[in-house]
A protein has these predicted regions:
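Short, positionally conserved secondary-structure boundary motifs
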Residues: 1-35, 65-67, 74-78, 89-91, ...
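Short, solvent-exposed secondary-structure boundary/capping segments
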Residues: 79-84
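Structural motif
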Residues: 41-42, 56
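Short, well-ordered loop/turn sites that connect or cap secondary structure elements
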Residues: 38-39, 52
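Short, Lys/Arg- and Gly-enriched loop/turn segments at beta-strand edges
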Residues: 52-59, 67-70
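Structured surface patches comprising rigid loops and adjacent beta-strands/short helices at the edges
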Residues: 96-103
């Protein structure tokens, strides 16, 4: 699950840009989402919520692995977390829990 101890800093974000709700920034790690324009070290702004729509990029807690950033995909009645890099495989949603939905990416220069 998301760890409160991992909080490094609290910042105020303008409601006019990001809306209301509980938000947090996550450092992207690895190359599984490069096809979506999210690179290792980028900051991803996440809205805390437990539900997602088909195509959303989500943070999910995967049993035995921890948190991961992937695209939420529905194929018929089956739901997967889909990496945006062909060298990785889909993760069945039954093995994980949605923590939030990505709403913005801040690139590191």
């Amino acid at each position: 699950m998301l760890e409160e101890e991992a909080v490094e800093e609290i910042v105020q974000l303008p409601v006019s840009l990001f809306g209301r709700g509980s938000l947090f920034l996550l450092h992207a790690s690895g190359d599984s989402m490069t096809g979506a324009g999210i690179d290792d070290g980028d900051l991803v702004l996440i809205r805390k919520q437990e539900e997602a729509q088909n195509g959303d990029i989500v943070v999910a807690f995967v049993e035995g692995e921890g948190n991961t950033l992937k695209r939420y995909r529905m194929y018929g009645q089956t739901v997967f977390l889909h990496p945006e890099n062909p060298k990785y495989r889909d993760i069945p949603l039954k093995d994980c829990k949605i923590q939030g939905v990505a709403i913005s990416v801040i690139k590191q220069l």
